Amino acid sequence: MRHTAERRWQKLTLPGLALAALIVPGAASAQQPSRDSRDSMELSIELVDPKVLRVCADPHNLPFSNEKLEGFENKLAELFAKKLGKSLAYTWFPQATGFVRQTLGSHRCDVIMGFPQGDDLVQSTNPYYRTAYAFIFKPGSDLEGIDSLSDERLKAKRIGIVAGTPAATYLAINSLLARAKPYALMVDTRIDSSAEAMVQDLKSGEIDVGILWGPMAGYYAKQETPALRVVPILKESGGPRLTYRLAMGVRAADQGWKRQLNRLIQENQSEINALLIGYGVPLLDEKDQPITADAPTRKP
């Protein structure tokens, strides 16, 4: 999961009240603007580019995004640009301290394609998927059927964990830290990947099981033959949550833009689900049931 450590940017105040003087009495009832024209007016006030979908993204952050446009957020941006009738452009910046401030907050782009819902660094759209931290292990191992960090089998296993993530708290709760191999939370993604390093250690036998953010676990599991097993961790209690809703992030002032994105999410949820499933993302509905390719129309 992505982690940033910056303060929220200041809202941009625009002199929009003067527009009210331009409204001719009775004109609104005589000719209501279409939804598209209302969107266009709102976006012009909000300084959202009306012709270009300007996306803020990390250039080295698979499975989410990269400069080769191979990530699922790249593909989602392509889908939305097509639906909006816009061209697509990127502002690239590493997903680390300063990401929001240097991209969305500086008006260099208009949307972050994936952000935890409720994070106060951005204004969130409605969520378009829900997922969780997950176990990742070799198929056919004696960990088949595991679904909790309290499972007794883990006491004899070497466990890979990204330090500082919510899942690491449960290793402490279950007295498993002595069995853990930590991986760095913040790395230079141009040259390093904690998720990829963990999967390599799993393949070599350095660790027996890894705990990764679900989209990363699913993506790397699909790269192997046979595919690695991915099991969302859904039963933990007494610590931080491990399940999250993911939305898009916009500026707090851009309410019309947020509404437009919300409509796109609602109208294209099945296509969004299918795209994410294709990348191995373990999708969950609100009852923690898996959303699969057999039933991709369900909402998060």
Residue map of PLM features:
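Bacterial N-terminal signal peptides
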Residues: T13-V24
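Acidic, polar ligand-binding/catalytic clefts
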Residues: E78, K82, S87-R153, G164, ...
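Bilobed "Venus flytrap"/periplasmic-binding protein-like clamshell domains
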Residues: P59-P63, E67-K83, F135-S194, P215-M216
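Alpha-to-beta junction loops
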Residues: K86-S87, G105-G114, K157, M198, ...
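Periplasmic-binding protein-like
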Residues: D58-P59, R130-D142, K222-I265, P282-P300
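Ligand-binding clefts/hinges and TM-proximal coupling segments of bilobed small-molecule sensing domains
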Residues: Q31-S37, I45, P166-V187, R229, ...
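Extended ligand-binding regions for polar small-molecule ligands
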Residues: Q31-R38, G71-K83, G140-L143, D147-P166, ...
